[in-house]
């Protein structure tokens, strides 16, 4: 009886192993997509104001840049 239970448990472990590996691979992919890193730098957008713009800027506002990443914009 113990041998049968042991063999059944081993068979279940062998049968479920590929499913566990597939889930782990999907979880690793999702984690890699969510982590900021070098990929975010490739998606960054930068906007600068041309010198001959219609509205003049004050001296303190000249040279400002807007850098946007994933919906978050910062003035530099």
UniProtKB/Swiss-Prot annotation:
Cross-link (Cyclopeptide (Arg-Cys) (interchain with C-73 in subunit B)): 65
Keyword field: Antibiotic, Antimicrobial, Defensin, Disulfide bond, Fungicide, Signal
Propeptide: 23-64, 74-76
Signal sequence residues: 1-22
Cross-link (Cyclopeptide (Arg-Cys) (interchain with C-73 in subunit A)): 65
Cross-link (Cyclopeptide (Cys-Arg) (interchain with R-65 in subunit B)): 73
One annotated GO biological process: defense response to Gram-positive bacterium
Modifications the protein undergoes after translation, according to the UniProt entry: Forms a cyclic peptide with subunit A (BTD-1), or subunit B (BTD-2). An additional intersubunit disulfide bond is formed.
Cross-link Cyclopeptide (Cys-Arg) (interchain with R-65 in subunit A) mapped to chain: 73
Compositional bias segments (type: Low complexity): 30-44
UniProt-annotated stretches for the region Disordered: 24-54
The keyword Cell membrane is assigned to this record: no
Subunit annotation: BTD-1 is a cyclic heterodimer composed of subunits A and B; disulfide-linked. BTD-2 is a cyclic homodimer composed of two subunits B; disulfide-linked.
UniProt family annotation: Belongs to the alpha-defensin family. Theta subfamily.
UniProt name for this protein: Theta defensin subunit B
Organism: Papio anubis
């Amino acid at each position: 009886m113990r041998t049968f239970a042991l063999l059944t448990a081993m068979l279940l472990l062998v049968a479920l192993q590929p499913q566990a590996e597939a889930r782990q691979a999907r979880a690793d992919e999702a984690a890699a997509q969510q982590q900021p890193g070098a990929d975010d730098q490739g998606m960054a957008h930068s906007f600068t104001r041309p010198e001959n713009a219609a509205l003049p800027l004050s001296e303190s506002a000249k040279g400002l840049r807007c850098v946007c990443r994933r919906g978050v914009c910062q003035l530099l």
